C-alpha cells in the first residue's frame, strides 16, 4: 500500500515534508512515493536513514504555487507535483495522496483526475477541530463549496458520520447543522431544508448547533455540517484564536518574574495543552467524496503533520472509507 506525498508545494520547501514522510516509513511502516524534483529530493534523502524499499522518488518538474489559478494550473502544469501525485492515485499505483500546497489546486486536481464517488454531489473538505477531551470534532464543509444546496449538506452529514466512525472510532457520532440558534426553526432557507432531510436519515441527529458548541461550550456534537463559506471562516478563525491565546499568555508571562517561575513549573501542562490544540496532530483535512483518498495539508505543515497525514491516508484506505461512502449514499438515496 503506497501513499503519494507532494513534497514541493509547502511554504518552506521540501525538506520538512520529506522528513515527515521518512518518519512515517521508519516509525509507522508506511510506503511512500515522494513526488517532486527528483534530483533535489534525492539530495535531501541522503540526510536520512530509512528502508529504501519503502521509498520511491517520482520526478515532477513543475510546482503550482499559492498564487496560481487552480483550474488553469492543474491543466497547464500537468507535470506539477500535485497533479503527478493525483495521477499516481488515479492509475492505482498509490491508494491515496497528501499535498500541503494550494488547496484549490489540490481539489481541482482530485476532481479532474479522480472524479467523484458515484452518487456524491459535491465533495466537502472535512476538517478536525480539536476538543478539550477526546477525539476532535469534524467540521464539513471547511471550504470546498461556498454555495450549497440542502441535499449537499445531507450528504455531508452521511460522509462525516462515516469518517468519524472509521477514523476517530466514535461508535454513534452526534451530527448537527451549524446555525444562528439551536431552535429547530433557526437558520436560512438552505439549512432549514437540510434540517428536515437529515432528520429523516438513520443517523444520530442533534439538530442545530451554535458556534460555541464547536468547542465544548454547549451541545455535545461530533460532526458539524455547513456550507464551505461559513466553514472556512470558522476554521481560519479557530486557527487564529488558538495562536492569539498562546501569544497573549506568552507576553503576560514575560511581564512578571513570578509568572515566569510559575510558567516553568507549568511547562509540561502548557506543552500538553498546545499538543491537544495543534492541528499538526491530525495531519490535514480530507477531501471526502472523491474517488481516491486525498488529504489536504496546511502550507506550513511540519514533519509531524506530514507523518500524521500519511497515517490518516493509510487508515482511510485500510478501512475502505470510500466504499462505505458509496454504499451509504446509494442506500439513503440522497
Swiss-Prot record:
Subcellular location(s) per record: Cytoplasm
SUPFAM superfamilies, per the entry: Isocitrate/Isopropylmalate dehydrogenase-like (SSF53659)
Molecular-function annotations in GO: phosphate:acyl-[acyl carrier protein] acyltransferase activity
E.C. number: 2.3.1.274
Sequence similarity: Belongs to the PlsX family.
Pathway noted in the entry: Lipid metabolism; phospholipid metabolism
Keywords assigned by UniProt, alphabetized: Cytoplasm, Lipid biosynthesis, Lipid metabolism, Phospholipid biosynthesis, Phospholipid metabolism, Transferase
Function (record text): Catalyzes the reversible formation of acyl-phosphate (acyl-PO(4)) from acyl-[acyl-carrier-protein] (acyl-ACP). This enzyme utilizes acyl-ACP as fatty acyl donor, but not acyl-CoA.
Annotated TM spans: none
Subunit structure: Homodimer. Probably interacts with PlsY.
Organism for this UniProt entry: Leptospira borgpetersenii serovar Hardjo-bovis (strain L550)
GO CC list: cytoplasm
PANTHER family membership: FATTY ACID/PHOSPHOLIPID SYNTHESIS PROTEIN PLSX (PTHR30100), PHOSPHATE ACYLTRANSFERASE (PTHR30100:SF1)
Reactions catalysed, as given in the entry: a fatty acyl-[ACP] + phosphate = an acyl phosphate + holo-[ACP]
Main enzyme class: transferase
Name under which the protein is recorded: Phosphate acyltransferase
Family annotation (InterPro entries): FA_synthesis, Phospholipid_synth_PlsX-like
A Pfam family matched in the record: FA_synthesis
Record GO biological process: fatty acid biosynthetic process; phospholipid biosynthetic process
Amino acid at each position: 500500500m503506497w501513499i503519494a506525498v507532494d513534497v514541493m508545494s509547502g511554504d518552506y520547501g521540501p525538506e520538512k515534508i520529506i522528513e515527515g514522510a521518512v518518519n512515517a516509513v521508519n516509525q509507522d511502516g508506511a510506503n511512500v512515493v515522494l513526488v517532486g524534483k527528483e534530483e533535489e529530493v534525492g539530495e535531501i534523502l541522503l540526510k536520512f536513514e530509512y528502508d529504501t524499499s519503502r521509498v520511491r522518488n517520482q520526478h515532477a518538474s513543475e510546482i503550482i504555487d499559492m498564487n496560481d489559478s487552480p483550474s488553469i494550473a492543474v491543466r497547464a502544469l500537468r507535470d506539477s507535483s500535485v497533479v503527478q501525485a493525483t495521477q499516481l492515485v488515479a492509475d492505482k499505483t498509490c491508494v491515496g495522496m497528501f499535498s500541503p500546497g494550494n488547496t484549490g489546486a489540490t481539489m481541482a486536481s482530485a476532481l479532474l483526475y479522480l472524479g467523484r464517488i458515484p452518487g456524491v454531489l459535491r465533495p466537502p473538505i472535512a476538517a478536525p477541530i480539536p476538543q478539550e477531551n477526546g477525539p476532535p470534532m469534524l467540521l464539513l464543509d471547511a471550504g470546498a463549496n461556498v454555495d450549497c444546496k440542502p441535499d449537499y449538506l445531507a450528504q455531508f452529514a452521511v460522509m462525516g458520520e462515516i469518517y468519524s466512525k472509521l477514523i476517530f472510532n466514535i461508535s454513534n457520532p452526534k451530527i448537527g447543522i451549524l446555525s444562528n440558534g439551536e431552535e429547530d426553526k433557526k437558520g436560512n432557507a438552505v439549512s432549514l431544508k437540510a434540517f428536515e432531510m437529515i432528520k429523516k436519515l438513520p443517523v444520530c441527529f442533534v439538530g442545530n448547533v451554535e458556534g460555541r458548541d464547536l468547542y465544548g461550550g454547549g451541545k455535545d456534537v461530533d460532526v458539524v455540517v455547513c456550507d464551505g463559506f461559513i466553514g472556512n471562516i470558522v476554521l481560519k478563525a479557530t486557527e487564529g484564536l488558538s495562536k492569539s491565546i498562546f501569544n497573549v499568555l506568552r507576553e503576560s508571562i514575560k511581564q512578571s518574574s513570578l509568572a515566569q517561575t510559575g510558567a516553568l513549573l507549568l511547562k509540561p501542562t502548557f506543552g500538553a495543552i498546545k499538543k491537544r490544540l495543534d492541528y499538526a496532530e491530525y495531519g490535514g483535512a480530507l477531501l471526502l467524496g472523491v474517488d481516491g483518498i486525498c488529504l489536504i495539508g496546511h502550507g506550513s505543515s511540519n514533519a509531524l503533520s506530514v507523518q500524521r497525514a500519511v497515517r490518516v491516508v493509510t487508515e482511510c484506505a485500510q478501512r475502505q472509507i470510500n466504499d462505505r461512502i458509496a454504499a451509504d449514499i446509494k442506500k439513503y438515496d440522497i
